[in-house]
Amino acid sequence: MNKKTFLKILTVLLFAPMSLFAQYPDVPKDLKAAADKMIDEENRYVDSVMTAGKTILANEAIHGKPYIPWAARPTDLPQARIPSFPGAEGGGQFSFGGRGGKVITVTSLADRGPGTLREACEGTVGARIVVFNVAGIIRLKTPIIIYAPYITIAGQTAPGDGVCVAGESFWVNTHDVVVRHMRFRRGETKVERRDDSFGGNPVGNIMIDHCTCMWGLDENISFYRHMFNPQDGRIDEKLPTVNVTIQNTISAQALDTYNHAFGSTLGGENCSFMRNLWANNAGRNPSIGWNGIFNFVNNVVYNWANRSVDGGDYTALYNIINNYYKPGALTPKNAPIGHRILKPESGRSKLGYLVFGRVYANGNIMEGNDAVTKDNWNGGVQVEEMENAGQYTDSMRWNTPFPKPEFPIMTAKESYDFVLNNVGANIPKRDIVDQRIIEQVRTGKAYYKEGLDSVEFYQFKHRRLAKDSYKNGIITDIRQVGGYPEYKGTPYIDTDKDGMPDAWEKANGLNPNDASDAVKDCTGDGYTNIEKYINAISTKKKVDWTNTKNNYDTLAKKGKLM
């Protein structure tokens, strides 16, 4: 190529529209304006509820449950005396959730109004425990945004097949939030609302357990930072999420409609992510979004395409311990990404040379690669475009774990079996969508709908993966895997409307005609009776839950509520 031709090409490239190279699509102004208006209106509504509830917030603060939206250190938020529930572990272990508050029963699948999940989350201020007496799909038209702190959402209480939140995002913009056995599958492909299934602006004391998060258009589930506006004319402050745990949870099959089939962005201060499954996400499995100690233990990562675990910055500390990596059909097995355990980033350093954070990586299995499995630093930890950490190894490699919350640790092989047997929203039951994901991880064979070769699904014009990638697990539209299943269930009888079925109350010596017994404690162990019901805790025997040796998942062991 001569110099004149090169200059012509360079000129064309310089003045070409940015959309030619854009990773993301252009959003029509009218659609963006409509989406922004929708979010603004929802925020104004929630703000009005919070303003009306100032007296309630002040009263809770007097009784040891203050509202602290500016929390930025683990010590900024008070900690409960006993775990959020038996089996809660990690950084979020001592979140209060809704303990001691009112019991709200979801009885409607509608987007908003009396008896809805939105009303329980957005329309109520004060500590609350949310239970379900309805089964089915909750189809949202706008995101649910939780601002009022101290809430427990107990998806395991739904009858029959349980519930699934669909259509829009579920945002946590507060602290002291406990969520168990919920399904968040957004499933929409609107260009103006490319957002997570489950995320938000989480402040801290977050405990997520046994949830299923799928079909997000940005990511499936992300918890790592929150933006705090001090309302004094300054710009928003970016603060870490503090005291956060995500355990026993699925992040799978993010939508690749716009090259963004991403699993999660995670992090914060005093954070723990253990016994989870990332499957069929092109990237961010997960990505690390903060520079605190990142504790990633006993997880399973399957069928990534261009990114496994990566992120952080030059000040980050990583505990990558006993995880199981299983390349899938879309993982480039002959490239460095095919056996990548971790790729730390050096971002935000203003030094004139590259600096990376410190890494403790040990006990991780890379299926199909004995060398990396034997020594995780033999190509498993990579920086820049290198096949390993190269000359940075000595400064990065740490031989002992960084300080982390105490919880039991399995081997990587044990964690593979445990995760596949236990992960996700499996009470009242594991649904067919989760079953298919688990089966693919086990066998390598993806489920997809036959006869779609001639169907035109929208795909971003610059999409990286092949059009038929859905046949190998990474999808652009939920119709490629059959969409939402049907959820059925018969409501239980709850005469006094206290969230506990009459049958359970009678079997456990409580009065089905006395709503006040829900917030009492029949054994004096610290868990209220409604907590005993939703977590399958004994009503006959007092257990010292302050003793960590007694901390086991009572609900998982029983496998059901009644």
Describe the residue ranges of each PLM region.
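Intrinsically disordered, low-structural-confidence terminal and linker regions
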Residues: A22-E60
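Predominantly extracellular beta-rich ligand-binding scaffolds that present long acidic/polar faces
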Residues: N295-R307, L317-P327, T331-T393
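Acidic carboxylate motifs that coordinate Ca2+ or other divalent cations, activating on Asp/Glu
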Residues: D494-D498, D502, D525, N529
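Bacterial Sec-dependent N-terminal signal peptides
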Residues: M1-Y24
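Extracellular beta-strand-rich solenoid/capping regions of secreted or surface-exposed proteins
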Residues: R118-G126, I138-T152, V163-R180, R186-V203
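Acidic Gly/Asp/Thr-rich repetitive segments characteristic of extracellular carbohydrate-active
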Residues: S84-V130
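C-terminal functional modules
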Residues: Y24-A35, G53, A361-N362, G368-T495, ...
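Right-handed parallel beta-helix
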Residues: Y150, G155, P159, H175-R186, ...
